Amino acid sequence: MNSIPLEIITPQRKAFSETVNAVFVPTANGRVGVLPRHIGLFTALTEGEVRITYGGKDWYLAIGGGFMEVTKEKISILVSRAVHADEINEADLKKAEKDARDIISQKGKTEERTVALASLRRSFLELKVLRHHKHRQLPSIS
């Protein structure tokens, strides 16, 4: 199977850098799949789950919004955050979910509720990534 280099970069770090067989990303218009020899593309990404296929397996990351550029040579994904399943602590997620639900249920400030809703959405996404692939890990980036 053909392959293409993929890099996923956040403001803090390079979250992923490997040669892959395919990547599937969330966009405002739905999921987009990119294979080697894909036509050039530049698109905005939404918060969601990225599926990466390489080494005969699928791997998942939770990402924040950002952009993807596809060229003949490589795929570059620049996002606000990228979280591997092995970086997620389920107990912390459940606490964050409970805290967010408590804030949302109170008649507090709209701003606090908006932040809590975003936190709740991130918690659900990260929990999905964690449960989807609890026993798989992406290679470490040095």
Label every model-predicted segment.
Residues 7, 69, 112:
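Acidic-residue sensor for enzyme active/binding pockets
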Residues 83-141:
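Acidic/glycine-rich phosphate/pyrophosphate-binding loops and surrounding catalytic core
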Residues 1-60:
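A positional/architectural concept
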Residues 38, 48-50, 66-76:
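C-terminal interaction segments
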Residues 58-59, 64, 71, 80:
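Long, amphipathic coiled-coil "stalk"/hairpin helices in large membrane-associated assemblies
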Residues 1, 141-142:
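Short, Lys/Arg-enriched, disordered terminal segments
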Residues 71-85, 89:
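Amphipathic, interface-forming alpha-helical segments with heptad-repeat character
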